Amino acid sequence: MQPVLQLMSRVGPSDANVLITGEHGTGKEVVAQTLHALSNRASRPMVTVNVGGLAEGVFESEMFGHVKGAFTDAKTDRVGRFDLADGGTLFLDEIANVPLNQQAKLLRVLETGELERVGSSKTHRADVRILSATNANLNEEVAAGRFRGDLLFRLNTIEIHLPALRDRREDIPALAAHFLSVHARRYRKHLTGFDSAALQLLLQHPWPGNVRELDHAVERGALMAQKNAVGAADLGLAASRDGSIQSGRLEDMSMEEVESFLIRKALTRHGNNVSQAANALGLSRSALYRRMQRYGI
């Protein structure tokens, strides 16, 4: 992670737009928060928008705002996310999910800094730095006609790629120790670390949910531990190294653990493509996002 940290330290103080890439749970929002904190805009707001979680048809109103009477449900004026972030940073998570028919409008705002609220012809300016994140390959999205190449160029002044946790296992002990310290303090427990079996399990687990899943597992371990050291059973990691449910464990799992496992399997099977995983699970994208947040995936 040292090259990533060095790049963040160089890019953070600038006003450059940054595209943060990596699988779900690799810490993209943490990187965005750090870049904002390093910038000259740190005293101003950082506004986060989960583009993938926006209901269909509301992107323009959410981002640019609207005036009363602009459409049937517009009972009052609404301030958009660009205006809320004025002078600060706007973080667009899951940027690949911006509707294609709205991408030209977003591009224009990024190029000019000018926007109009829905239902208004009055143009005004918003001074924002754009940080965006995605787990998708945007070059492939451009080639497939689902994402505008000119918008990608505007967003991607600098790209910061976060490797999957399974590709940097040497970071697991330090990350786990950090999360344990945080959760031990939160739950007012005296915990000295992990026993050897727990540490071995942490090092061998496939971590399809990456750092977020590790944090979730360590939090559970902190809650469940009855000794000073967290044990393997406390972590609630029901999957083996190859990601399959261990023999004899299914009947011991709660409904929440089974659902969490199935979501992780679907994401792994579909290359962390949320739309495809949601379709395979019979869920809407927004429903899957809610479950992923619930289970720390």
Segments predicted by a language model, with ranges:
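AAA+/SF3 P-loop NTPase mechanochemical coupling elements
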Residues: 47, 74-87, 91, 99-105, ...
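Nucleotide-binding/hydrolysis machinery
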Residues: 2, 13, 39-44, 119-129, ...
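Base-recognition residues in the alpha-helical recognition helix of bacterial helix-turn-helix
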Residues: 104, 108, 116, 153, ...
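Conserved post-Walker A coupling segment in P-loop NTPases
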Residues: 6-73, 83-99, 164-169, 190, ...
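N-terminal pre-P-loop "Q-motif" helix
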Residues: 1-7, 255
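The short alpha-helix immediately C-terminal to the Walker A/P-loop
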Residues: 29-34, 61, 94, 105, ...
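Bacterial C-terminal helix-turn-helix
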Residues: 20, 27, 33, 249-297
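Conserved RecA-like P-loop NTPase ATPase core
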Residues: 4, 26, 49, 63, ...
